[in-house]
């Protein structure tokens, strides 16, 4: 049905997604408006399969579609249950912990403790931080590999859910045709068959003719109930569509956040840490140079003025362009905030999946009850 529509006409199920409408008649009217000639031929063919007074045939009418819907619901439920996003949250928590483990203040001499500066352990401290940063960087690289795997799995899940969404559309189309075919047959019996039977019974007064009319009316009542059951199944398909999209959107948002961490946040953190270490080493180099200049100044009194001037100018030039540590801290805080937002999205996704799982279980039980009642 969908493939034969022109590109500028939306599927009724997509219209429902856009307008969040549960108006059963509106969806049915939209469906009838979009019927192609092939659809009309299929409706006619399906309608002709309904044999009046064939109660067993009526019982089986559309049952294969409903069984497919039951299997389809199982697929979605299994997917929701099997995709535990816990490892994603744990991996992101590990990443955030590693980013916090290296404090920019540790490589800023001005913010070190007085005791540490008193014993002149600045150089040793920087080396220690550099060594720790290398270790953390290696650990972050390993975490990045895990995040890549999680992102790939989330992307595959989105594609799988999209396939399920298309299958749900196909089911919606097929069950809608069965509903229209049954309604067509019902109208035919009410407007043609029953009036003829009533006329015959009125003319003959034969009890068997009267019973035949009553049997046909009873068949119409059962047919009407069968139509209602199929409409319930179609409503399940309508409600399933936004649930699939909800899970898809959460997975997609989480995958995008992971990609942002991998491609932007982590490289930026590494670059900024490397820059900070380089600048701190330059600061130490300037300090050492100043000491050498002072010593030389004492030994060579005749060149004291010139050496002092050169030392000051050199120190001034070397001091230019040093990045503020506060900027580095702000950058790191932004990185951590990004990861925290990702964790929040993951938590929201878990809650939404739990809601979806509960609703799907209820829908499945409802469908099973109708199937069981249909077989009685």
Swiss-Prot record:
<dbReference type="InterPro" id="IPR008863">
    <property type="entry name" value="Toxic_anion-R_TelA"/>
</dbReference>
<dbReference type="Pfam" id="PF05816">
    <property type="entry name" value="TelA"/>
</dbReference>
<protein>
    <recommendedName>
        <fullName>TelA-like protein SERP0976</fullName>
    </recommendedName>
</protein>
<comment type="similarity">
    <text>Belongs to the TelA family.</text>
</comment>
């Amino acid at each position: 049905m969908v493939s034969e529509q022109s590109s500028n006409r939306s599927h009724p199920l997509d219209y429902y997604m856009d307008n969040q409408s549960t108006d059963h008649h509106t969806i049915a009217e939209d469906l009838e408006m979009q019927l192609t000639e092939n659809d009309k031929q299929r409706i006619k063919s399906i309608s002709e399969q309904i044999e009046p007074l064939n109660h067993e045939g009526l019982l089986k009418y559309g049952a294969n579609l409903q069984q497919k819907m039951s299997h389809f619901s199982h697929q979605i439920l299994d997917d929701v249950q099997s995709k535990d996003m816990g490892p994603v949250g744990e991996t992101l928590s590990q990443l955030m912990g590693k980013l916090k483990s290296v404090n920019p203040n540790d490589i800023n001499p001005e913010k070190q403790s007085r005791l540490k500066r008193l014993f002149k352990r600045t150089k040793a401290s920087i080396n220690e931080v550099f060594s720790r940063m290398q270790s953390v960087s290696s650990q972050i690289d390993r975490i990045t590999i895990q995040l890549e795997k999680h992102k790939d799995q989330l992307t595959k899940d989105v594609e799988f859910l999209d396939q399920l969404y298309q299958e749900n559309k196909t089911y919606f189309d097929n069950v809608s045709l069965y509903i229209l075919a049954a309604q067509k047959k019902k109208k035919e019996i009410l407007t043609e068959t029953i009036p003829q039977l009533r006329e015959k019974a009125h003319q003959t007064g034969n009890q068997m003719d009267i019973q035949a009319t009553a049997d046909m009316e009873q068949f119409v009542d059962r047919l009407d109930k069968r139509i209602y059951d199929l409409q319930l199944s179609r409503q399940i398909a309508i409600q399933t569509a936004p649930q699939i999209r909800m899970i898809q959107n959460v997975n997609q948002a989480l995958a995008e956040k992971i990609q942002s961490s991998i491609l932007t946040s982590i490289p930026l953190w590494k670059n900024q840490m490397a820059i900070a270490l380089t600048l701190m080493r330059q600061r130490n180099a300037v300090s050492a140079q100043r000491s050498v200049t002072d010593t030389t100044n004492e030994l060579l009194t005749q060149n004291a003025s010139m050496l002092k001037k050169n030392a000051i100018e050199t120190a001034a030039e070397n001091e230019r362009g040093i990045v503020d540590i506060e900027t580095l801290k702000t950058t790191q805080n932004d990185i951590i905030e990004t990861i925290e937002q990702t964790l929040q999205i993951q938590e929201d996704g878990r809650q939404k999946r739990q809601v979806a799982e509960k609703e799907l279980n209820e829908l499945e039980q409802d469908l099973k009850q109708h199937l069981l009642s249909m077989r009685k």
